[in-house]
Amino acid sequence: MLKAVHFGAGNIGRGFIGYLLYKSGYEITFVDISKELVESINNYKRYNVIILKDNVEKEEVKNIKAIHIEDEENLSKAIVDADIVTTSVGANNLKSIGEKLINYLKIRKANIDKPLNIMACENALFATNILKNSILEKGDRDFIEYVNQKIGFPNTAVDRIVPNVDIKKELPIDVAVEDFYEWDIEKKAIIGDLNIRGAELVDDLEPYIERKLFLLNGAHATTAYLGYLKGYKYIHEAIEDDFIRNIVSRMQEEASLALSRKHNIKKDDLERYASKVIKRFKNPYLKDEVVRVGREPTRKLSVNDRLMMPAKLCYEIGITPEFILYGIAAGFLFDYKEDPQACKIQDDIKNFGLEKTISKVTGLEENSDLLQEIVKKYKELKETFRKR
């Protein structure tokens, strides 16, 4: 049986990546920092993926085990034996994962000659490159030559909504997911064979990454931040609000126009994709909380992420990103008390002022047109919804 090692045994790891790897015939070893989660996986040796739709389905994933990330002996054996290594740990953790992999790959080099593909499955642009660079930058010439010859680092675009929904479970590690998924993999970077059921191998990954980042992730964040302002608990409630749905649809139109010009994608294809995204948001079975989708606003409002990137692209090609900027402005009003990044943004606004805070988070110059438009929309939204 093929063997996979997956870093990150959370909901995405189990409900999306692990699920597809299992359906593709892999025996999966999850690696995680949570001792409790590792113990649960090793205790049950299986879990169920609950697919949320009109007729709820349940699919079992088995042939699994787990290793704690500090268990170097067993993790080393797993990496040596692996046919594929994947991650869903958050882009901020990829560098440290890459540094951990160096020693394990050196042991693999000394023991086995078969190729290996390593893929970061994260909501970030070309995330696998982060892993690859962190591995190569500390290697000697011989190790670098081995990595370049024997290890593939395909970038990926991944998409599946995995909410923290309260649903009856057989096992505590069961996970609920939406029916839709998409996993696009950079074909030219694969070494050897790579067969994952349901994944699509593509020649040019950038259009797929940006389409998903702008039209799904950007629209999701906009729905969450506006939904939070209007007092909605769930995404499916927020997207049914005419005011919110109009802004989200219009920001998708702006981003689609920019994508069409940059990548020569047919506008009809982008319209169909955007429409499908809105339909997914309306799924009432997901019960996806706006505070989950809006969490970590410092990251989501940063220069190369889901809102600022399409806004800047629009501006550079002469499109006014009016509705994308509403989403960004709403993000600076996201003051959820249990989110450390949201609290830090609000503290910075109080201590240093709105313009300096927006500049710090987004990377925009304080006197730039885009920043000043964000300020205007921030004040407009605050006046409309916060009356304080």
UniProtKB/Swiss-Prot annotation:
**Could you list the residue ranges that cross the membrane?**
none
What reaction does this catalyse? Answer: D-mannitol 1-phosphate + NAD(+) = beta-D-fructose 6-phosphate + NADH + H(+)
Q: Which InterPro entries does the UniProt record give?
A: 6-PGluconate_DH-like_C_sf, 6PGD_dom2, Mannitol_1_phos_5_DH, Mannitol_DH, Mannitol_DH_C, Mannitol_DH_CS, Mannitol_DH_N, NAD(P)-bd_dom_sf
The residues that the entry says bind NAD(+) are 4-15
Q: Name one Pfam family in it.
A: Mannitol_dh
Q: Which EC class does it fall in?
A: oxidoreductase
Task: Kindly indicate whether the keyword NAD belongs to this entry.
Answer: yes
Q: Does the keyword NAD apply?
A: yes
BP terms from Gene Ontology: mannitol catabolic process
Tell me its EC number(s), please: 1.1.1.17
GO molecular function terms attached to this record: mannitol-1-phosphate 5-dehydrogenase activity
Which positions are tagged coiled coil? Answer: none
- Please provide the record's keywords in A-Z order: NAD, Oxidoreductase
Which GO cellular component terms are attached?
Answer: cytosol
NCBIfam families on file: PRK02318.2-5 (NF002652), PRK02318.2-6 (NF002653)
**What family classification does the UniProt entry report for this protein?**
Belongs to the mannitol dehydrogenase family.
Name the UniProt record assigns to this protein: Mannitol-1-phosphate 5-dehydrogenase
What lineage does UniProt assign to this protein's organism? Bacteria, Bacillati, Bacillota, Clostridia, Thermoanaerobacterales
Gene name for this UniProt entry: mtlD
